[in-house]
């Protein structure tokens, strides 16, 4: 079509969910709710090669009707309908020996039914976890650029997320020590920048992939009357090695690290790393294999997190 390729498609889904949570001890409130959701999706995409490169233009249309009932009564404030169009466009070309691509996409992420549930979960006498039927879908705008030369690759990405879903804690009642934990939508857009450089050399029996990157967000939240800036970046490094040995042996050595830093309203307060090693022997033209491996040899794959919220 028009010297290019045109594709269309669609899907339809209907979901009915019912939750009946009864707590006779009255540690947490009992609840009786149900949700009906109808989702109609259609998409179209056009791609074409021209003299200076290749481009793709597309769009995705979503119509969602969500009805929420509590004790068999329709709750208008928590029921909603969506009609949205999410475009995508990309262009790729070659400049000398460098391949490059730039793309822009808009995507949506619906909250899970577990997060939308109105039931409460008793954790201990100091904390109760609850769903949130009022959660909205996340909408993320992505702008990405990728360039590659031989075995080197550089990627830059910028994301702007509206209605980002975060885990939040606040007192269940005034002057009480019990904390209510639930997911909420941020009331502001969440910008995030990421940059990665990777190399994938292959020399003789050795094949390797090294990736180094940084992810940084810009977020300020109100926590217990104070403005907290959650802007500390996180650094990531991954090194994967494989050695093809005689007699169908394959030796692998993998390493990864993640630094401290912020991700939404969670602070990762520990440097995390691991080293894995494995030796595999294959038989019968790879139809049978035996592997011996050791994971996290130095026992450094540990995490320590801090939830920043209103509690």
Regions found by a protein language model. Give the residues of each.
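Residues on the lipid-exposed face of transmembrane beta-strands in outer-membrane beta-barrel proteins
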Residues: 1, 42-48, 89-93, 143-149, ...
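Face-selective signature of the C-terminal outer-membrane beta-barrel domain
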Residues: 1-71, 94-99, 152-155, 191-214
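Membrane-embedded beta-strand positions of outer-membrane beta-barrel proteins
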Residues: 8-10, 57-59, 89, 102-104, ...
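Transmembrane beta-strands of outer-membrane beta-barrel pores
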Residues: 12-18, 48-52, 61-67, 93-97, ...
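Outer-membrane beta-barrel translocator domains and adjoining extracellular loop/strand segments
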Residues: 18-27, 67-75, 113-121, 126-128, ...
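Outer-membrane beta-barrel signature, preferentially recognizing the C-terminal barrel domain
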Residues: 34-37, 77-80, 108-162, 179-194, ...
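Conserved C-terminal beta-signal and adjacent last beta-strands/turns
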Residues: 89, 230-311
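Outer membrane beta-barrel strand-and-loop segments of large Gram-negative receptors
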Residues: 136, 142, 153-212, 220-238
């Amino acid at each position: 079509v028009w010297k290019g390729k045109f594709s269309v498609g669609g899907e339809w889904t209907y979901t009915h969910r019912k939750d009946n949570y009864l707590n006779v001890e009255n540690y947490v409130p009992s609840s009786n709710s149900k949700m009906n959701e109808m989702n109609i999706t259609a998409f179209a995409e056009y791609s074409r090669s021209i003299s200076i490169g290749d481009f793709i233009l597309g769009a995705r249309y979503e119509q969602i009707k969500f009805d929420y009932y509590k004790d068999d009564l329709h709750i208008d404030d928590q029921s909603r309908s969506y009609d949205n169009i999410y475009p995508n466009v990309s262009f790729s070309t070659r400049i000398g020996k460098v391949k490059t691509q730039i793309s822009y996409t808009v995507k949506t992420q619906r909250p899970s039914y577990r997060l939308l549930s109105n039931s409460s979960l008793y954790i201990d006498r100091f904390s109760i976890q609850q769903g949130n039927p009022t959660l909205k879908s996340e909408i993320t705008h992505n702008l990405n650029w990728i360039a590659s030369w031989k075995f080197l690759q550089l990627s830059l990405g910028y994301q702007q997320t509206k209605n980002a879903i975060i885990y939040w804690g606040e007192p269940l009642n005034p002057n009480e020590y019990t904390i209510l934990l639930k997911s909420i939508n941020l009331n502001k857009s969440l910008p995030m920048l990421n940059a990665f450089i990777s190399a994938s050399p292959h020399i003789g029996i050795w094949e390797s992939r090294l990736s180094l990157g940084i992810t940084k967000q810009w977020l300020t939240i109100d926590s217990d009357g104070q403005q907290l800036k959650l802007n500390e970046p996180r650094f990531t490094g991954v090194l994967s090695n494989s050695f093809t040995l005689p007699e169908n042996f394959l030796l692998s050595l993998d390493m990864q690290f993640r630094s401290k830093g912020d991700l939404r309203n969670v602070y990762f307060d520990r440097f995390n790393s691991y080293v894995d090693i494995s030796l595999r022997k294959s038989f019968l033209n790879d139809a049978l294999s035996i592997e011996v491996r050791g994971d996290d040899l130095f026992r450094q794959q540990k995490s320590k997190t801090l939830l920043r919220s209103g509690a």
